[in-house]
Amino acid sequence: HQFIPFTQSAGGQNTGAVLVNGDIGGDLVINGSWSVSGYHSIGRPSSVTNLDADDLQQGGSAVAIHASVGGGVTIEGMGVEDDVDDDGDGITESAGDTNDDLSATILTYGSAPTIAIETDGVNNIVIGTTSSGYGLHVQGTLAASGVYDNVDATAIRIAGSGASTVSIADGITLDRLVSAGASNGSAYGVVIGPNASTSVLLQRGVLAANVTSDNAEEAVSVLINAGGNMPTLTNSGTIRSQLFGEIGAATGIRDQSGTLTTINNTGAIIALLIPTDADPADSIPAPPATGPAVAIDVSANTTGVTINQTADVVFNDEDTVDDDVNARPTIQIYGDILLGSGADTINLLKGDIIGDVSFGAGADSLTINNAARFAGGITDSDGALTINV
């Protein structure tokens, strides 16, 4: 059992906070406040003309894992809701556990992922199961910020290299806040890279990617690269990708691997392009933002994808009181949906889908029931679409 509770700020080129280069037989548990940057300043100035290369050095990841962890990885925190024993130490708040709600806050400023689970190109990485039942369980806050122009930001990246692989047992669960933001660069929330695999992404908190740019950049909350593998995504929280500016792309979920076959949504999946006005004091309106706003892009899939949007269920955790009910988002998919050449199915049984749906080829099906609403266009390349209302 490796428990890391510290408060730490690290600075300098390639500097990190937690580095795992050797196998851990038990679990890795991280709490406290962590901040990593290679920059001279993490405050974005109005002008960078006085900054030289030493002021803009790139730091490393706050948490870099390059070896196996038998008992999984937990970023501690309150999680989805305030329970009687959030830290799982057997002592409840009513019994005097003053640290029960202590949540990790892990921040990176620069291009390095906040959490990187990546191989060295030689050895495989296996992340086992935590006591909560997941391989990677984020109950606290993770944030990545590029800060300066042309610096991409990534909150979580899991990837193999060469012939070596990364396997996350029993999925990834996000229970609080994971975010990435960039200026004139791209932002990525969770990236499942080549040679990386996990069974499910269970998103119960807020997962966000935000970009401010007048260049052709992108904000993507969930990205599965070609060569990655993740068959299921279940969202009961909010997945939000936003691009502020004139041109670019906002994508909630993009699968380039063709392995994502089931998406369950009882929360919100949102992709937005938001025009910005450089001079709000004048009478000239901001130019419209142009580019794709895609909630779900599984167009690389050839075997068929099922998207289920259904009613919310009471959060099943340690207590009998559903304390987070007031924080639940309105059930919706806002943005376009791009499907592939397989037999795809959309079951819209609660809430709204607002956006155009491209079914592609295959024997596809769209079912709308229970007063759910669809607003948008529908295209199907081969005419083999069945609609049930």
Q: Which residues fall in each region the model found?
A:
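Surface-exposed loop/turn motifs in large extracellular/passenger domains
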Residues: 1-354, 358-375, 379-389
